[in-house]
Design a protein with these regions (language model features):
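Predominantly extracellular beta-rich ligand-binding scaffolds that present long acidic/polar faces
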Residues: 1-221
Length: 221
C-alpha cells in the first residue's frame, strides 16, 4: 500500500494548501500527493500548491520518497512552496535511497520545475537533495528554473546536493536557481547545488551559499 493521497496521480492538481500533514513511510515509494505523479502517456500539472510544516517519518528502505511525489514522470511543477521535515523516524539509519524535498525520483518523460521553493530538513541514504533526489538516466531534458531550496540535507551515503542529489539523465537545465541549506553526507559526492551530474547539462545564473561536508572527503563542491 502507498502512503500518499493517490497511488498514482494523473491530470491536474491546482490551488491547494496543506497545513501540517504527516506521513509515515515504510517499504513503498511515497509523497504527499502520490507515490507516482504523471505517466509517459498522461502529462500532469501540479500548480499553485502550498505545503506548510509537512512531516514525513521514514521507517523503512523504500526507493523514492518526496515531499509531493515519490516519483515524477512527465509532470510540470509550478508555483509551489513546501516546508517539510523528512526524517529517520527510528533514528537507526535505515532510510530510503532517492529522497527529495519535492520529488524522490524523476524518471522517463522529463519533468519541469518552475518557481518551486522548498525549506526545512531532509535525511536519506543515497541520492538525497532539497528538491530532486535522483534524475534517472532515461529522463533527459529535465528543467529546473526560478527555484530554490533552503533545506538542510543530510545523507548516510553519497550523491547529496542542495537542489539535486544525482543527475544521471543528460541535458539537464538548471537556471536562475539557488540553494542556501547545508549539505552533509558520510560518503562522497556532495555539492551545494548538485551532488553528482552526468552528461551534457547546462547550469546558468545559479548559486549555493550553505556549508558542504562529505565525511569520506572526496568530490566536494
Amino acid at each position: 500500500a502507498y502512503t500518499s493521497m493517490f497511488g498514482v496521480m494523473l491530470g491536474s492538481f491546482r490551488n491547494v494548501t496543506f497545513e501540517k500533514p504527516v506521513l509515515t513511510v515504510g517499504s513503498s515509494s511515497a509523497g504527499l500527493l502520490g507515490a507516482q505523479c504523471g505517466s509517459k502517456d498522461v502529462p500532469t500539472e501540479i500548480k499553485n500548491v502550498t505545503v506548510n510544516d509537512l512531516v514525513i517519518n521514514m521507517n523503512g528502505t523504500a526507493e523514492g520518497v518526496g515531499g509531493l511525489a515519490g516519483r515524477a514522470v512527465n509532470v510540470k511543477f509550478s508555483d509551489i512552496t513546501l516546508s517539510a521535515n523528512i526524517e529517520d523516524a527510528d533514528k537507526d539509519g535505515k532510510v530510503p535511497d532517492s529522497v527529495g524535498g519535492l520529488v524522490g525520483v524523476a524518471s522517463e518523460v522529463p519533468s519541469m520545475f518552475t518557481n518551486v521553493h522548498t525549506s526545512g530538513a531532509i535525511t536519506g541514504n543515497r541520492r538525497v537533495a532539497g528538491m530532486i533526489g535522483f534524475i534517472v538516466e532515461n529522463s533527459e531534458n529535465v528543467v529546473v528554473e526560478k527555484s530554490s531550496s533552503a533545506m538542510n540535507v543530510n545523507a548516510f551515503g553519497e550523491n547529496t546536493g542542495g537542489l539535486i542529489g544525482y543527475a544521471e539523465g543528460e541535458h539537464l537545465t538548471v537556471k536562475d536557481s539557488h540553494s542556501t541549506g547545508t549539505v552533509e553526507n558520510k560518503g562522497n559526492y556532495a555539492g551545494g547545488l548538485i551532488g553528482s551530474m552526468c552528461g551534457f547539462s547546462t547550469i546558468s545564473r545559479c548559486y549555493a551559499t550553505g556549508d558542504v561536508l562529505a565525511k569520506a572527503g572526496n568530490h566536494i563542491g
